């Protein structure tokens, strides 16, 4: 057993998990449960009353956090300590949304001035493009942006841009390309005019296979459509650490934006990786996004653990994963603009906490990162919600909804809200056999048929959920929401004693992919790998089954 599972608190939680009453009983016995188990900060309201928890549960979970030195680990992250131990890096995405007055030390120097300089450079660039001052190679203004990246440099900008669609104000169109499948970029290029298109290439090394391949394809298209090598600088900019490679490509050094080792890809949308966002919503709104995230950072760093929203959410996720064998967690967004958030949180959580050894290399004997999935309400109610209500797996849920709609049409939002709240109630209370029989009492079915149908209509309830509300979806509230989930992810990793900031599984996939690519291009059939890999490579080389 590991130190964590040997602890008295862990053992107490395991015993306590078997003694929790049904949530129906918990609500019946405590009329103040909603007010006692809700929290408001940074423009967000969290109702965590529909969890399998009593005051004793929270006390035990908070004790577990204290024993894991969560407070000290939070301070270490904000202080710029080397908490990504396998890569010997600080973890300072929080510095990207810091204020100019702060001092944050990384690698022996204050990094805040460079962050502020980059924001100012972004401001100048966004103004140049959106004002029409930036011209393409034929003198036309830019109308379309193509953002080329992968992972965090793709998903963050895309999902945030989608979420903030009501704040698009610059008249630009933005297209996102990530997958190395040629169909992805080909379909985008069919829509574009090379004279009015600007490409943003985002890659720390300027060598990420998918991103570089797509960028080279974009460049070849641009040159084939009338552009010249000397025109590349007017249509390509880069966010990268490798200035030399970017300038060799033809990008003007003045149009290269920095990336830093102390920011992981899945935490990078707050940096110049967020250029596509800023080009769509303007820098004032982009700064509001940063402001909301900074407010959540301040809350996370300073609020007592018992009143700390990311801590509460992280502890409950751990509670279900480690003591109720919950293998997945569903995120349900009751707002069309937020429909992409489950995929974003999926990458954030699963790439961060999909680990199986502790910081000192000991194999864990407890579950770590769950599968994160989800979708848009109310669509999911007519699909996978069935499994949430009557399936055999316990799947904790997060419901996210703004109280006010950007598009208040008739009763649409009232119906949306009623469905959201109704689902949380149904998951919590379920339906008993007696209740199901009562519903069938006036039917013409025989008693035997009624009993049979009633058994099929029984729902156990006691299915946990959090509900997150905001007044309205704005850049500021979105920033706070995303930062909330970043810190929630950190809380779990800190207690599990794993490194939430490396991704060696991703790196292995890249390495083996490059090796296979070389074998695909070889003259002879593949023979050196396992039989399956050899067979697949050779079938691909034949081009038919």
UniProtKB/Swiss-Prot annotation:
Pfam families found in the cross-reference section: PGI
Any Gene Ontology biological process: gluconeogenesis
Subcellular localization(s) per the UniProt record: Cytoplasm
Main location: cytoplasm
Pathway: Carbohydrate biosynthesis; gluconeogenesis; Carbohydrate degradation; glycolysis; D-glyceraldehyde 3-phosphate and glycerone phosphate from D-glucose: step 2/4
GO MF, one example: glucose-6-phosphate isomerase activity
Gene3D superfamilies recorded: 1.10.1390.10, Glucose-6-phosphate isomerase like protein, domain 1 (3.40.50.10490)
Sequence similarity: Belongs to the GPI family.
PANTHER family tied to this protein: GLUCOSE-6-PHOSPHATE ISOMERASE
NCBIfam families, sorted: PRK00179.1
Name listed for the protein in its UniProt record: Glucose-6-phosphate isomerase
The organism of origin for this protein: Shewanella sp. (strain ANA-3)
Chain's gene name: pgi
